């Protein structure tokens, strides 16, 4: 049977279309609809809070590992329940579409849609981990991302155009009904050949995924790689639109580059990346595509140097997003291989959250760096930010290894730790993470001041982080605290995985 002849594989790929629909609606279409309806821009800005469930889905994923619903098996029951909720919310949105002045109702529906969508994403990702065979991972990774992006393009792009010709009530009704065939796919999708044992307690479902993953050999290098592999791309893509506008391209040029050429290149690259990973091997694919996505940023440096030149800009955009797609296709295979089936929901949510973390943090960092260095030098710098990720790749997948093995038990670091000693080390990890993050942001702010003609001074940004006054400063401080807590928890989980926990306090 060929790689597309498996109903398992086709089910996973088709369900990814259901994942992409609500994302395009909440992220793109609803804000555009509100702006066209004349809603205050400050109110529209609050709609970004509706995106929060996708960022925090790790919080309720352990419950989905622990408590399967009574219908359709361990993960398909959660998928179907989420799709039923999305249909109901879509119909509700269609019902209030002729009353955009009911903005808070629309906001509440958008938030509920995001929560149902994030829950669906957790379940679909976990189902893919459990049901797919290893030889299907490459085709699945490429196909899933291609269908996901296509659905986002429909709900976040085509829907806006169609609403201009008809109405938002009609568009939202169509989007709600689009989940019905996806529900049929969910109902007919097969169960895994070997159903993994569910965690026996909620505590096991929360703690087990972290300790189980960190007990693997080279797990820390793998986690660092997950965070760093797409760092150069994240920094570049955070400011692509403002960069093109400042260079002098008009709105039509920017739209063609980002919406048409960019989407087509990204979808084609991801689809091809997944398929090539199957033939090249995961190790070689990560190496080749990693270098391509790093050096593709030099195309933007050329645009910054040359100025307004449409062919050069279009080529740079296609090369950068196409190579990004190749890397994403291989990376999707890596996530499927790394996730343990017993904790499929939580571990995949954890790894995918770590993967998206640099994208969330890249905007502020990229803005400060571009302001401090200028556009050309900023894009050259992004090439060097890709090197740490490749160094981590060399730690667990040397070039000579085509298919890496991840289920090797790591050596012990010593005798079991007492709880008090574990707490002290976790607090140390949190403080070190906080200091490192604060120092990096302060250096970037100081460099921005140098570019503006001021002396290099780390104290003002440090004082702003320690005693914030503005909304921006409070946001930065909150981000640093979240980063510190993550560092502390990661330190504790790693030590428990490698040394164990003594029953003595």
Task: Name each model-derived stretch.
Residues 2-51, 220-225, 229-243, 247-248, ...:
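Helix-loop boundary and gating motifs at the non-cytosolic
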Residues 79-100, 291-308:
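C-terminal ends and interior cores of transmembrane alpha-helices
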């Amino acid at each position: 049977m060929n790689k597309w002849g498996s109903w398992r594989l086709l089910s996973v790929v088709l369900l990814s279309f259901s994942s992409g629909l609500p994302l395009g609606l909440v992220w793109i279409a609803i804000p555009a609809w509100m702006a066209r309806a004349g809603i205050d821009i400050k109110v529209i800005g609050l709609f970004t809070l509706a995106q929060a469930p996708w960022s925090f889905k790790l919080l309720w994923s352990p419950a989905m590992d622990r408590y399967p619903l009574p219908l359709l098996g361990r993960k398909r029951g959660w998928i179907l329940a989420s799709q039923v909720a999305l249909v109901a919310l879509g119909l509700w949105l269609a019902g209030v579409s002729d009353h955009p002045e009911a903005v808070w109702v629309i906001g509440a529906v958008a938030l509920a849609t995001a929560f149902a969508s994030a829950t669906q994403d957790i379940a679909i990702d976990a189902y893919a981990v459990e049901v797919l065979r290893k030889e299907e991972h490459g085709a699945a990774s490429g196909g899933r991302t291609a269908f996901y992006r296509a659905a986002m393009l429909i709900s976040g792009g085509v829907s806006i155009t169609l609403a201009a010709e008809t109405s938002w009530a009609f568009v939202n009704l169509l989007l709600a009904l689009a989940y019905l065939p996806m529900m049929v796919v969910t109902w007919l999708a097969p169960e895994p050949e070997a159903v993994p044992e569910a965690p026996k307690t909620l505590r096991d479902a929360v703690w087990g995924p972290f300790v189980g993953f960190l007990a693997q050999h080279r797990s820390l290098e793998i986690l660092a790689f997950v965070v760093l592999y797409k760092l150069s791309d994240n920094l570049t893509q955070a400011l692509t639109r403002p960069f093109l506008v400042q260079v002098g391209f008009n709105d039509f040029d920017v739209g063609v580059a980002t919406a048409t050429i960019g989407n087509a290149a990204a979808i084609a690259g991801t689809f091809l990346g997944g398929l090539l990973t199957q033939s090249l091997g995961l190790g070689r694919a990560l190496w080749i595509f990693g270098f391509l996505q790093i050096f593709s940023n030099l195309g933007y440096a050329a645009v910054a140097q040359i100025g307004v030149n449409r062919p050069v800009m279009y080529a740079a955009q296609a090369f950068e997003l196409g190579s990004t797609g190749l890397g994403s296709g291989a990376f999707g295979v890596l996530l499927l291989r790394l996730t343990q089936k017993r904790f499929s929901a939580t571990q995949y949510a954890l790894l995918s959250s770590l993967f998206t973390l640099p994208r969330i943090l890249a905007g502020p960092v990229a803005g400060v760096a571009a302001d401090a260095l200028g556009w050309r030098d900023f894009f050259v710098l992004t090439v060097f930010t890709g090197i740490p990720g490749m160094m981590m790749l060399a730690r667990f997948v040397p070039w000579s290894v085509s298919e890496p093995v991840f289920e090797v038990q790591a050596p012990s670091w010593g005798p079991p730790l007492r709880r008090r000693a574990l707490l002290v080390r976790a607090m140390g990890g949190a403080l070190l993470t906080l200091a490192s993050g604060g120092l990096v942001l302060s250096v970037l702010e100081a460099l921005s001041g140098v570019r503006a003609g001021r002396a290099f001074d780390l104290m003002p940004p440090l004082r702003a982080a320690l005693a914030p006054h503005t909304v921006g400063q409070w946001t930065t401080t909150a981000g640093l605290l979240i980063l510190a807590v993550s560092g502390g928890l990661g330190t504790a989980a790693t030590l428990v995985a490698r040394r164990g926990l003594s029953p003595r306090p």
